[in-house]
């Protein structure tokens, strides 16, 4: 008899959780103006208003990182990588908490973890390829120009001052390009912020940088196609 009562109590305790999960609906949002790619977010929420509040916050976070990591444009009121590349060889450039934390992570964590494959200091070389690609007559960059640029991609020449929160380049030819890690980092930070705001079930796909938050209602895992 006691076992039956215990089993009944467990069933009753599970009912509210199941009911809450069943009340949540699937929503989505798509943006085309972030990181030069398609950004898709889908997830479960109690209402359209709740979902809209979450996606507006996520869009704001992603847009902020998009501006911070942009090496081609300046934005009013923002010190971003465009500004750093333009000024850091002349004098240390003070940057925001977010940008400094990202650059420190790139140098101290991402670079050694990938054995140097994610070198954000390789901007001088990547710029040559970008300019060649955007030219009216696209062609591979000059070999001598590439060789010269390769002498200015040592990440140790990226000087980060924790106390002053500044960025400085040892060589004027040096440039940063965070294309290898920028979107992934932005997606991770955006997902963490969304979780802190209470989002429990979502899938972010920002140009192939995928991050799941929790599971679907009922415990089913999120799935994402890989091309």
Model-derived features with residue positions:
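Mature catalytic core of soluble alpha/beta enzymes
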Residues: 2-13, 17-227
């Amino acid at each position: 008899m006691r076992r039956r009562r215990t089993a009944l109590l467990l069933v009753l305790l599970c009912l509210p959780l199941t009911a809450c999960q069943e009340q949540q609906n699937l929503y989505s949002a798509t943006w085309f103006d972030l990181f030069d790619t398609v950004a898709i977010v889908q997830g479960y929420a109690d209402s359209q208003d709740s979902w809209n509040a979450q996606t507006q916050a996520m869009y704001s976070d992603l847009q902020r990182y998009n501006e911070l990591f942009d090496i081609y444009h300046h934005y009013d009121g923002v010190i971003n990588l465009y500004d750093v590349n333009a000024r850091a060889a002349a004098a240390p450039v003070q940057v925001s908490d977010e940008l400094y934390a990202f650059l420190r992570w790139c140098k101290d964590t991402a670079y050694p973890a990938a054995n140097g494959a994610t070198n954000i200091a390789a901007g001088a070389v990547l710029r040559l390829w970008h300019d060649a690609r955007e030219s009216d007559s696209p062609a591979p960059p000059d070999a001598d120009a590439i060789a010269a640029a390769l002498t200015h991609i040592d990440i140790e020449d990226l000087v980060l001052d924790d106390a002053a929160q500044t960025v400085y380049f040892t060589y004027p030819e040096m440039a940063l390009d965070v294309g290898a890690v920028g979107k992934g980092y932005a997606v991770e930070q955006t997902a963490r912020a969304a979780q802190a705001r209470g989002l429990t079930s979502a899938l972010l796909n920002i140009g192939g940088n995928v991050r799941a938050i929790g599971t679907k209602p009922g415990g089913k895992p999120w799935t994402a196609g890989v091309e």
